[in-house]
């Protein structure tokens, strides 16, 4: 799955608002434009017009990463993502992974410490090792969803880049050093992976049950 930088911004905004303001989700074009142009929690800060955002929405719809929805008696079209964790998306992520991908889409490369701080409204990580666990799982998928960048000069921690829109060729990738994680992270990774797998199975069963109930009704 490849995204342009603007598509990444839109998907990131939809993921964020779905979690932080669920009563206002899906989003109208106006709300989505405001979210894309937010001055906080966005790097870089943009100034997109509604027509520019609509063009991006049309492109995402063609990629089947977006769906439109209109309320009963309302002419306002609203938009919701099909990026992950829906019956239409192949990509299934844990809540921790969604939070990390969301921040990386909205803010670019981040260190584990930065991610722990900046995901606080999306998912509660007890410590940095839990962030590292999720990053390790994302990086070790058959098609990696994040990549660790080489440590910058005079910096203690490496940053991570999402692989959907991040142009890896523009960065120095950490090809020599293994991803540094704590002992706790290494010990719990397998357990967390099993939990994620079970959560995904439960979600699929719930979706199938809902489909059966709709047929019976």
UniProtKB/Swiss-Prot annotation:
It holds the Pfam family DUF480. Gene3D superfamilies: Winged helix-like DNA-binding domain superfamily/Winged helix DNA-binding domain (1.10.10.10). InterPro entries: DUF480, WH-like_DNA-bd_sf, WH_DNA-bd_sf. Coiled coil: none annotated. Belongs to the UPF0502 family. This is UPF0502 protein Sfri_1696.
